[in-house]
Amino acid sequence: MKPGSDPWAVLISLAHCLRLEVTSPNESTVQKDSADGLAPMSLQRVEESLTRHGYAFVEDEEHPDILRARFDDYRFQFMLTGEERGVLQTRGRWNHTVDVSRKVEIIKLCNEWNMNRIWPKVYVRRESEGLLGVYGELAADFRVGALDTQVDNAIACGLSTVIAFFRSLEERLGDELDDLDA
């Protein structure tokens, strides 16, 4: 498997999401945070995480509970959902639109991804009379609070896995990408 291929990207993103570390016997990894450090989720904590990683983002003027950013030319939103606003949702939109005549084909590609992977959830949504958007999202439940590292990992996992899906979609469609957005 060569770097850059879809399975490789998914494997790398999974390792990144899970923060896999290899240690020798009788050796432990250093834990910077402890369970005592759980703090309630807030949009400010999401902003702090994005800032810590040097990611540029903007606050949505129309929706003050949403942060927006671009990664690899894909649009992303970060928001807190749920009754207690404790579920962090990272949602990305593919940078192409699809004619409604290709709906079944694109839904099949999304369903194939969803059947073979735990995350992110991917789907197709009608955006106008004749155009569809393709989305990927990952939700992390932090209703009991979270460590900074958990927030950081949830954002990194959401970004890397959604982008892996978009790249997989582009690879599958190949030359047909030129026909989109027309």
Sequence positions of predicted segments:
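Glycine-rich, aromatic-bearing surface loops/beta-hairpins
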Residues: C157-A164
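Long, continuous compositionally biased terminal/linker segments
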Residues: F71-I107
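Short, internal acidic amphipathic alpha-helical interface segments
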Residues: G92-E137
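Short, highly charged C-terminal tails/helix-capping segments
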Residues: E170-A182
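Short, ordered beta-strand-loop transition motifs
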Residues: V58-H63, G82-E84, R125-L132
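A short acidic/glycine-rich loop-to-helix N-cap element
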Residues: F142-I155
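Charge-rich, low-complexity N-terminal segments
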Residues: K2-T81
